[in-house]
């Protein structure tokens, strides 16, 4: 048996729960020094450094003049994708766009009785960079990453949207990625992967423009690079391994549960798959079903390692306990396979995305339902949210006083300024109300 169910009240169950509650980790991933060197090289050498690293790790024949994807390459990409893909792409774009356009925020103003005007001005950032992983050398293009990161930026009104992605050894990028980017209005695409791609977006080179926001998933080098440049640019988040928590009662189908745990496990050997169930029979049926389905998967080796090392099945007393534990764990993806999932929604406080009912696999949210699939991991759902339109917006406060309004507030402003020992602040009011 790849995974053995535990009772939540047992010592083993409590130990597993403790590890889940303390899974947040930020430390040296083992590549910090190497990434720092890459960032320094790109900052100082620009395109030359990007080309150097690209030649070393991706395309041996890369040149600076070939970093930017050309119109001819885009046109060729359209010849290489089929009509079925274009149909699915259009449908996914419509779903994702329809959801995210509801997130757009408006500027607002408030005029008080004394004539003071205060408000908030909402504006998009000028530029955003999307990092899209190569996807097993381009053989498994991550089209969903293009859509989930690029569409919200477009809705926000970002003028300059650029994409970087590693080329294959032949210097080419997956036609599916090129078409997806083009269909959502991204016209600047560059062949730059890993930490040097992030560095180029953060610092700018002669070819690749510097941006204000960097979003997109990647390996430990990409994640470390984003962490190191955050502060000088906004990043979406520091993402850990992907994770799912399934709450199931006696009505849940072990086949569905196993399928969804494996869907998570095939991402990464470090992916986390958790089942909290009120039913012992369900808990005992799932491991056998996992083993049966595992044999059919293309990424069986990765999924099996993830299940063996990282999967957890805990039997709990009731749904209330399961929801309480789910809130404590603050999972990225929360699935409710129970009789009345909607009844529990008011009790859920911490989850990146919530999937209600047995016919709502996480995969629907990953690709097509509409909500964003870039979600907080490692327990950060306690305070963080999914990537969205807001990721690409910034807000400025508006304040306008009339002479009468300032006269009315002057005493209060000066009193607080003097209390803090900032007499120049107080004086800046006093000289206006003499």
From Swiss-Prot:
Its EC number is 1.1.1.23. GO terms for molecular function: histidinol dehydrogenase activity; NAD binding; zinc ion binding. The active site is at 332 (proton acceptor), 333 (proton acceptor). The keyword Metal-binding applies. CDD domains: Histidinol_dh. Its cofactor is Zn(2+). Binds 1 zinc ion per subunit. Gene3D superfamilies: 1.20.5.1300, Nitrogenase molybdenum iron protein domain (3.40.50.1980). Substrate binds at residues 242, 264, 267, 333, 366, 420, 425. It catalyses: L-histidinol + 2 NAD(+) + H2O = L-histidine + 2 NADH + 3 H(+). InterPro entries: Ald_DH/histidinol_DH, Histidinol_DH_CS, Histidinol_DH_monofunct, Hstdl_DH. Zn(2+) binds at residues 264, 267, 366, 425. It comes from the Bacteria. GO terms for cellular component: cytosol. GO terms for biological process: L-histidine biosynthetic process. Pfam families: Histidinol_dh (PF00815). Transmembrane segments: none annotated. Pathway: Amino-acid biosynthesis; L-histidine biosynthesis; L-histidine from 5-phospho-alpha-D-ribose 1-diphosphate: step 9/9. Belongs to the histidinol dehydrogenase family. HAMAP family: HisD. Catalyzes the sequential NAD-dependent oxidations of L-histidinol to L-histidinaldehyde and then to L-histidine. This is Histidinol dehydrogenase. It comes from Desulfotalea psychrophila (strain LSv54 / DSM 12343).
């Amino acid at each position: 048996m790849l995974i053995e169910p535990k009772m939540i009240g047992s010592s083993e169950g409590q130990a597993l729960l403790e590890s889940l509650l303390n899974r947040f980790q930020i430390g040296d991933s083992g590549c910090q020094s190497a990434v720092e060197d890459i960032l320094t090289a790109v900052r100082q050498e620009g395109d030359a450094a990007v080309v150097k690293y690209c030649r070393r790790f991706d395309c041996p024949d890369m040149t600076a003049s070939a970093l930017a994807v050309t119109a001819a390459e885009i046109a060729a990409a359209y010849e290489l994708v089929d009509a079925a893909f274009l149909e699915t792409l259009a449908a996914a774009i419509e779903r994702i766009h329809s959801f995210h356009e509801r997130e757009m925020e408006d500027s607002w103003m408030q005029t008080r009785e004394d004539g003071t005007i205060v408000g908030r001005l909402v504006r998009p950032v000028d530029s955003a960079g999307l990092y899209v992983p190569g996807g097993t050398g381009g053989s498994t293009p991550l089209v969903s990453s293009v859509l989930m990161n690029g569409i919200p930026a477009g809705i926000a009104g970002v003028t300059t949207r650029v994409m970087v992605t590693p080329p294959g050894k032949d210097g080419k990028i997956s036609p599916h990625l090129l078409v997806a980017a083009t269909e959502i209005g991204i016209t600047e695409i560059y062949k730059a992967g890993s930490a040097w791609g992030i560095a180029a977006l953060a610092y700018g080179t002669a070819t690749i423009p510097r941006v204000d926001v960097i979003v997109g998933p990647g390996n430990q080098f990409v994640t470390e690079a984003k962490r190191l440049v955050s502060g000088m640019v906004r990043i979406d988040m520091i993402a850990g391994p992907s994770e799912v928590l399934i709450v199931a009662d006696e009505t849940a189908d072990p086949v569905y549960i196993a399928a969804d745990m494996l869907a998570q496990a095939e991402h990464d050997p470090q992916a986390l798959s958790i089942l909290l169930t009120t039913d012992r029979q369900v808990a005992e049926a799932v491991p056998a079903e996992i083993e049966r389905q595992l044999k059919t998967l293309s990424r069986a080796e990765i999924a099996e390692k993830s299940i063996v090392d990282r999967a957890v099945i805990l039997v709990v007393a009731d749904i209330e306990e399961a929801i309480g534990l789910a809130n404590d764990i603050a999972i990225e993806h929360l699935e409710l396979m129970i009789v009345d999932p909607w009844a529990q929604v008011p009790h859920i406080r911490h989850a990146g995305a919530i999937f209600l009912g047995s016919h709502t696999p996480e995969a629907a949210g990953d690709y097509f339902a509409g909500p964003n699939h870039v979600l907080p991991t490692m327990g950060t759902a306690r305070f963080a949210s999914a990537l969205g339109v807001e990721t690409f917006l910034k807000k400025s406060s508006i304040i306008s006083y009339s002479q009468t309004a300032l006269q009315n507030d002057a005493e209060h402003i000066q009193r607080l300024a003097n209390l803090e020992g900032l007499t120049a602040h107080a004086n800046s009011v006093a000289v206006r109300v003499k």
